[in-house]
Structure formats: C-alpha cells, structure tokens
C-alpha cells in the first residue's frame, strides 16, 4: 500500500497485491469509490477487470478484488475499510468450479445432462457471491448455465418477493451484475418463505419443471446445468424447503457454506448420489443488519423502476378499478374447525383471495401476471413485470401507479405483495 494523495479532494490509495491475495473494501454511507486496475490481472467475483478502466462502487458496497498472479490497484474515495488479505478460500472455490466443468465435459461426451448445483448456508456466509463466481467461471469457458434464485428476500434475478431463473450468456458486469434481459419470474409476495411455505415449495417445483422443459429442447442449457441460490433459513420448514428444492431440481451437487451441522443433515437426508461439499465462507463476508437489508431491498426495487443509477424514466398513470382484478395468494389462517369439509390449511395457503382496491393499497407492489384468465392458476403463472401504487382515489374509482412501461397494462390480473416501496429519492 502506498501513501494517500488528495487528487480532486478524494483520497487516493495504491495497493500492490501479491499472487492469490485480495483487496477488500467497503464504501462509506453517502460516498462512492472508484477502483482502477493499473497493472497485472484481477477479478471481482469471477468477472475480470479491464486494465486502466475506472469502476464506480456506491455507498454500502462490499467488494473483494482477487488476483491469481499479482496486480496493482488504485482506490479513489472514502472507504469504511480497505485492506489486503492472504486468507481467502478462492482456491477451494476454483477447485469446485473445476470439478463442475469436468462433469459438464462428461455430460457432453455421454450425452447426459450437466451438473445442477445448489448453494446453501445460513444468512451472511456469501451464498450469492459463490453463485456469481461459479456462473462467471462457467460462462467464461463458453458455457450457458441457468441461475435459479430461490432467495425471496434478495431477488437478484428480479425484485424482492419473487423467485426466478435467468439464462446466463455473458459474465456479470462489475458494477451492475448479470444482464437481466429476459428472466423467468414468479410472484411470491413476501421477503420471507415462512409467510407461505406451501406457495414457496410450489413455485420451486414450477421453476424446476420449466428448467427441465428448457433442457429438453436446448442441449447447451442442459449440459451447462444450473446454479441455485437459496435463502438463509436452514431450520425447520426452511430446511424442509431446501430438501424439497434439491429433489425438485434433482441436484447433483450441494455446496454448504460454513455450517457443519447443515452439511451433515443434508448428507444424511439427500440421496447417496448427491455430492455434498462443505466449503468455508470468505473472511471478507460481513454481517448485514436488518436496516441494511431493507435499504438493499429498496434500492433493488428503485433500480427496477429507475434503472441502474437512474438511467430510466418510469411512467405514472391512472388505472380504473374496473379495468383490473387484484388478488392475494393465500387466505388468512383460521382454525381447522372453521374450514370447509375436506379442506386443509395447506389448501388455504394457495387460495386466490380477491382484493378490493382501497387506500390501504398505497405503496404496495403489484405483480402483473401473464395469465389470460383465473383458470390458468395465477400462483403458477409467470409475471410480466411490476407496478407500485402511489395513490388511490376511492371516489373516482381509480388508482395511480408507477410503471416501467407506458399505459396500458399488458394484462389485467394483478397480484398484491406484502412489500411496500416509498419513492422518496
């Protein structure tokens, strides 16, 4: 590390990294930091950096820049922390990628399907990062893996409160992440699987079915396999949901991060042909507070409407109550004795409940279903996009929405989320 200079009033620091080390830094609140690779080669979560190009990271970003052979880096701006570490599990992650690539080559040779990998672990162990890494390494070798997002709290394929899949055709952008051109997205409606575990498992199965259908007609997708990101709920129903996902996708490999107990439980409960691997989390992984998670969710939703760093201009328009049908998936829990004969609480969890538009809808997100009619089973139909209700005029029977596309709405079936978004910026 070299001395700091105050170029353009921003502190600038140079770092000389030895082979197989990484620079870790976190960006201060309300600040941004620029990173530049001056010499050598380096990567961020499997995406190679271009030399002499400045990459900008905004407030709250937590970044690890790794080098296999050594490099020179320059940071400009105020960081909360910035240090070089030799203690990194990257070699273990690379070995995992190499083993998966061998499975893909074997699948090509024997005309079988490629590896289906599920990454599991408690919260804040770096599951999303490992997924990104494995996907980037695969696509850099010419593969076309599918990224499956089962973490409803994060929504990296779409927005929080959804589950989805994305066909990866190029490495993730250093700043923006994976290019989200045509994701397959399903409405869940909450940031916690426990709010409706029956629906969560049903959508997991639906995603697996659609992925299998794609693999039947797309040989490259089949050989490349998939990488499945999961949520950090690993006990009780959360654990059962992991076992269900492994079964639905017929996974070949489960990567367990940082929890020996979970590793042993899965080894015991999954079929013997599933390879279960225990890997350490990176020392750079930091614990995220509830406030930070909420801010990240809000930022993700804001990005959906306004684009990365505000490059889009969303549309505001009125929607008549009579033009749409709004539903919530899952009826409130009632005592078993009050349920109709032959009906269980589980049936109740998948029930479509009509929602009458009212002022309590303000700030709620609505998923625009691709369904043509309710007989299509709205809970298992993908969504075209999302709108947020900004105001409701009960007297004139209209509500105003913020939408990424101009009027009219593509379909008239809407599913309401528990998630709210207040457009304050």
UniProtKB/Swiss-Prot annotation:
GO terms for cellular component: cytosol; mRNA cleavage factor complex; nucleoplasm; tRNA-intron endonuclease complex. InterPro entries: Clp1, Clp1/Grc3, Clp1_C, Clp1_C_sf, Clp1_N, Clp1_N_sf, CLP1_P, P-loop_NTPase. Gene3D superfamilies: Clp1, DNA binding domain, P-loop containing nucleotide triphosphate hydrolases, Pre-mRNA cleavage complex subunit Clp1, C-terminal domain. The keyword Transport does not apply. It comes from the Eukaryota. It is found in: Nucleus. It catalyses: a 5'-end dephospho-2'-deoxyribonucleoside-DNA + ATP = a 5'-end 5'-phospho-2'-deoxyribonucleoside-DNA + ADP + H(+); a 5'-end dephospho-ribonucleoside-RNA + ATP = a 5'-end 5'-phospho-ribonucleoside-RNA + ADP + H(+). One of its GO terms (biological process) is tRNA splicing, via endonucleolytic cleavage and ligation. ATP binds at residues 22, 62, 124-129. Its EC number is 2.7.1.78. Disruption phenotype: Early embryonic lethality. SUPFAM superfamilies: P-loop containing nucleoside triphosphate hydrolases. Its cofactor is Mg(2+); Mn(2+); Ni(2+). Pfam families: Clp1, CLP1_N, CLP1_P. Component of the tRNA splicing endonuclease complex, composed of CLP1, TSEN2, TSEN15, TSEN34 and TSEN54. Component of pre-mRNA cleavage complex II (CF-II). Also associates with numerous components of the pre-mRNA cleavage complex I (CF-I/CFIm), including NUDT21, CPSF2, CPSF3, CPSF6 and CPSF7. Interacts with CSTF2 and SYMPK. Belongs to the Clp1 family. Clp1 subfamily. Polynucleotide kinase that can phosphorylate the 5'-hydroxyl groups of double-stranded RNA (dsRNA), single-stranded RNA (ssRNA), double-stranded DNA (dsDNA) and double-stranded DNA:RNA hybrids. dsRNA is phosphorylated more efficiently than dsDNA, and the RNA component of a DNA:RNA hybrid is phosphorylated more efficiently than the DNA component. Plays a key role in both tRNA splicing and mRNA 3'-end formation. This is Polyribonucleotide 5'-hydroxyl-kinase Clp1. It comes from Mus musculus.
């Amino acid at each position: 590390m070299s001395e700091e200079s105050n170029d353009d009033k921003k502190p600038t620091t140079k770092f000389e990294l030895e082979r197989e080390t990484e620079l870790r830094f976190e960006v201060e609140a309300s600040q941004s930091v620029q990173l530049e690779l001056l010499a050598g080669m380096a990567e961020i979560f499997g995406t190679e950096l271009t030399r002499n190009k400045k990459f900008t990271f905004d407030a709250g970003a937590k970044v690890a820049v790794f080098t296999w052979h050594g490099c020179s880096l320059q940071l400009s701006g105020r960081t909360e922390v910035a240090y070089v570490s030799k203690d990194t599990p990257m070699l273990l992650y690379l070995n995992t990628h190499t083993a998966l690539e061998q499975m893909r080559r074997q699948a090509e040779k024997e005309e079988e399907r490629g590896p289906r990998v599920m990454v599991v672990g408690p919260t804040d162990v770096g599951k999303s990062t490992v997924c990104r890494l494995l996907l980037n390494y695969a696509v850099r070798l010419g593969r076309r893996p599918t990224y499956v997002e089962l973490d409803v709290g994060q929504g990296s394929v779409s927005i929080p409160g959804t589950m989805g899949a994305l066909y990866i055709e190029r490495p993730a952008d250093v700043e923006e992440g994976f290019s989200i051109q045509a994701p397959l997205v399903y409405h869940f409606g909450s940031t916690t699987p426990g709010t409706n575990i029956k629906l969560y498992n049903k959508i997991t199965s639906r995603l697996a079915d659609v992925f299998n259908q794609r693999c039947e007609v797309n040989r490259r997708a089949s050989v490349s396999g998939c990488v499945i990101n999961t949520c950090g709920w690993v006990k009780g129903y959360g654990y059962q949901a992991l076992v269900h996902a492994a079964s639905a996708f017929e996974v070949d490999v489960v990567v367990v991060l940082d929890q020996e107990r979970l590793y042993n439980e899965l080894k015991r409960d999954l079929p013997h042909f599933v390879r279960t691997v225990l890997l350490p989390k990176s020392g750079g992984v930091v614990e995220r507070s509830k406030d930070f998670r909420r801010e990240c969710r809000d930022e993700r939703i804001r990005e959906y409407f306004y684009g990365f760093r505000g490059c889009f201009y969303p549309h505001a328009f009125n929607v008549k109550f009579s033009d749409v049908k709004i539903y919530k998936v899952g009826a409130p829990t009632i005592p078993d004795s009050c349920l109709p004969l032959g009906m269980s609480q589980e049936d109740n969890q998948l029930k479509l409940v009509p929602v009458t538009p009212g002022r309590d809808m303000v700030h709620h997100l609505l998923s625009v279903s691709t369904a043509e009619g309710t007989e299509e089973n709205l809970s298992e139909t993908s969504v075209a996009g999302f709108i947020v209700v900004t105001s409701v005029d009960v007297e004139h029977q209209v509500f105003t929405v913020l939408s990424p596309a101009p009027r009219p709405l593509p379909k008239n079936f809407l599913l309401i989320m528990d998630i709210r978004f207040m457009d304050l910026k």
